[in-house]
């Protein structure tokens, strides 16, 4: 399912998503949404929670619903500079959890059967079946592939790096990639960190701060 580009109301969207000329890109994002609708393409919207929208979960959620978006994803946009300082666009400590709590209250129970929020769906799946549907809740990372614009295949959209290139969609089949040693070794990295790192969240921290280019 493709990821649609329109994730926030205009004032929030244009805070960080600017064109090369410095103008906001919200209008273009809306046009992209209409192209998908015109061709009857189901789509998902992945919303980054940043310092711009960290205090406005209800507004973001209601905006997406008003745009007819039924499949929502929300992830925290946390990045640090070379000195370990949180970048200005990253949400403040504690704001991500507060955002999710308020988002859940806006979603449940009124729209829980109509609107899919991937994180909440995965928590429910984990509770009912023991099987999560999102990578951070799993014990390993071999869940999907990413295909770049040139056909190159990588194990994850957060790990698009030359040394992790698995092949190209034009000459490689996914079945062979699924069993490739490089893919399996990379996917077991989370479990290896969990076995060797100290407690108190070190697994998440080490994996989250691994070099990535996506």
Regions flagged by a language model, labelled:
Residues 2-3, 29-33:
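A conserved non-catalytic segment of reverse transcriptases
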Residues 160-214:
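Flexible mid-to-C-terminal extensions adjoining Fe-S/redox cofactors in radical SAM and related proteins
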Residues 7, 77, 205:
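Flexible loop residues that form catalytic
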Residues 149:
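A cytosolic small-molecule/anion-sensing beta-strand core signal
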Residues 15-27, 34-136, 140, 146, ...:
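Radical SAM enzyme [4Fe-4S]-AdoMet core and its adjacent flexible, acidic
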Residues 1-13:
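Conserved SAM/AdoMet-binding glycine-rich loop
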